[in-house]
Structures are given as structure tokens and as C-alpha cells.
Design a protein with these regions (language model features):
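A short acidic (Asp/Glu
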Residues: 19, 75-78, 132-136
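Substrate-recognition element of Asp-dependent hydrolases with the DxDx(T/V) motif
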Residues: 41, 45, 50-79, 90-96
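Preference for well-ordered, secondary-structure-rich cores of eukaryotic proteins
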Residues: 19-22, 55-62, 112-117, 130
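Conserved Rossmann-like nucleotide-cofactor binding loop
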Residues: 13, 20, 72, 130, ...
Length: 160
């Protein structure tokens, strides 16, 4: 199947979070190196290969978006710090169901008249089985990060 839109989760899919306390993840963050940002009681590490994967998808004219159950301000800050915020079209942040988030991404494409993408042209990647199952229910293809694929590099090979 030819996927036109790849939708990623963030936490434990494109980056990992280590927390030193039980507080919600929050900034401000500062970049420690190109893959690591430190905030108030947490360290966020962008998985190796994410930037390369995003560049390759862009070169192949694939649309890329996000569906993350995270604080929008935190997500935006981290995406900017890691230098990848421009890669994602119509990202969805907040506490909505992932199937709703993906549907909202598709609607945003239709609303601006840019593209009509069907759920069957979407690949959704998440680390949580219930999220993957919910998005599969709208007709999208899915991959469970950690089971179907174990790394960004493995995903890059699948998407070639």
C-alpha cells in the first residue's frame, strides 16, 4: 500500500522521557545536545534517526503529522528545540482519542483544500496497543512501536 500520510505518536515513539519526579512533564527546556533536552524534573531524548527519517519522507513527498496525548505547549517547545517542528502538518495534541486525532488531521487537509487523503492512505505509529487498535478501526494501517517495529531505523527500512 502506498501511504501518503504518516502519523506519529511522540512519547516512546519519536522520543523517550525520563522523569526524576512524579510531576507532569513541563518546560522550559534547554538543549543539552542535539538529541536531548532537560526540563523541570524530566529529560526528553529524541530517538536517533528521527531527523533522517523525516527528511527522507519529505523528499519522497509524504505528508507527516502527529497525534499525541501530551501538553501542546510542551510538545511545541520540544519539537522546536529539536528542530523538527516544521516537518509536521496539522499536528494534534491533547487528550482526545487517537482515532479522533487522526480523523482531525484528515479533516484539516480537506478543509484547506490541499489534499483529500483517505484513512486507507494513512500509516499510524504508536507505542500503545489500544491507540493502534482504535486507529486501525477507522481504516488506517498501523504499527505498534516496540512490537511491530523496534527502532526508527527499522521503520525507515519499511517505509523505503
Amino acid at each position: 500500500m502506498l501511504y501518503r500520510l504518516i502519523v506519529f505518536d511522540l512519547d516512546e515513539t519519536l522520543w523517550t522521557i525520563r522523569q526524576t519526579n512524579m510531576q507532569p512533564v513541563k518546560g522550559p527546556f534547554r538543549l543539552v545536545n542535539s538529541h536531548e533536552a532537560v526540563g523541570q524534573g524530566s529529560t526528553v531524548t529524541l530517538f536517533r534517526g528521527v531527523r533522517t527519517l523525516l527528511r527522507n519522507l519529505e523528499r519522497r513527498d509524504k505528508f507527516v503529522s502527529l497525534a499525541s496525548r501530551s501538553d501542546p505547549d510542551v510538545c511545541e517547545e520540544l519539537l522546536r528545540l529539536f528542530g523538527v517542528h516544521h516537518c509536521f502538518l496539522h499536528p494534534q495534541f491533547g487528550w482526545q482519542e487517537k482515532s479522533t486525532a487522526v480523523t482531525n488531521v484528515l479533516k484539516a487537509f480537506r478543509d484547506i483544500g490541499k489534499e483529500h487523503i483517505t484513512p486507507q492512505e494513512v500509516l499510524f505509529i504508536d507505542d500503545w496497543p489500544a491507540n493502534v487498535e482504535a486507529v486501525r478501526g477507522i481504516g488506517a494501517a498501523t504499527l505498534l512501536f516496540g512490537r511491530d517495529i523496534r527502532s526508527i531505523q527499522e521503520l525507515a527500512v519499511i517505509l523505503e
